[in-house]
Amino acid sequence: ALSVLLQXSCTMCLFCCYL
C-alpha cells in the first residue's frame, strides 16, 4: 500500500498512516 512508501506520512496522505 502507499503507507509503505510514505511511512505514514499523514501530511501527504491522510489515509496512508492508517493503512
Swiss-Prot record:
Q: Does the keyword Secreted apply?
A: yes
| Organism from which the protein derives | Hastula hectica
Q: What is this protein called?
A: Augerpeptide hhe9
Task: Return one GO MF term.
Answer: toxin activity
Modification note: Contains 2 disulfide bonds.
Which cellular component terms (GO) are annotated to the entry?
extracellular region
Q: Is DNA damage among the key words of this record? A: no
Q: In which tissues is it expressed?
A: Expressed by the venom duct.
Q: What is known of its domains?
A: The cysteine framework is XVI (C-C-CC).
Q: Which lineage do the record's taxonomy fields give for this organism?
A: Eukaryota, Metazoa, Spiralia, Lophotrochozoa, Mollusca
Q: Which domain of life is it from?
A: Eukaryota
Q: Where does the record say this protein resides?
A: Secreted
The UniProt keyword set, sorted, is: Disulfide bond, Secreted, Toxin
